[in-house]
Amino acid sequence: MTTGTFDMSDLKRRMQGAVGVLRDELGGLRTGRASASLLDPITIEAYGARMPLNQVATVSVPEARLLSVQVWDRGMVSAVEKAIRDSNLGLNPNTEGQVLRLRIPELNQERRQELVKVAHKYAEAAKVAVRHVRRDGMDHLKKVEKDGEMSSDDLDRLSKDVQKATDETIAEIDQTLAQKEKEILSV
């Protein structure tokens, strides 16, 4: 937001950033169903640097509860296998040549409830981030109006727009959480 003006698109972009972070965090929750994004946080020591798994291998989902990791460089297979074992995801790869197969174990009801709580925590953090963006926007609007660069009518109109954008983003967060909760609890 620049001085003297108010950039609503920047405000919405920042709010959507919070939703994007939430989706990334929820994508990393293991739900008992195979998903290629489950392995996104894993990095491998390769070629003298830490690299994401998707830069040294292809991850696919051949079955609902099976991940397949096709490592491109034969010399990297053991490093990829070690990184997956050390990832705290509870996955145990079976290696067949350059392909690692990962069976996704069933989740018990207690673990599902724990995952739902974690998902709620992530969603609440996203809502707090959106509220911070709203507060920044409202503070900026009040400052611009106080400096005489905006009428009180414009302030009221833009304040309502900021609140509407906030409400829409919070609703999107709630919808994303509800989808993930349903996915976690479905057996």
Curated annotation (Swiss-Prot):
- Classification via CDD domains: RRF
| Official protein name in the record | Ribosome-recycling factor
NCBIfam families in UniProt:
frr (TIGR00496)
Segments spanning the bilayer are: none
Instruction: Show the InterPro entries listed in the entry.
Output: Ribosome_recyc_fac, Ribosome_recyc_fac_dom, RRF_sf
Q: Which domain of life is it from?
A: Bacteria
Q: What does this protein do?
A: Responsible for the release of ribosomes from messenger RNA at the termination of protein biosynthesis. May increase the efficiency of translation by recycling ribosomes from one round of translation to another.
Which Gene3D superfamilies does its entry note?
A: 3.30.1360.40, Ribosome-recycling factor
User: Which family is this sequence assigned to?
Assistant: Belongs to the RRF family.
Q: Which UniProt keywords apply?
A: Cytoplasm, Protein biosynthesis
UniProt gene name: frr
One Pfam family here: RRF
BP terms from Gene Ontology:
cytoplasmic translational termination
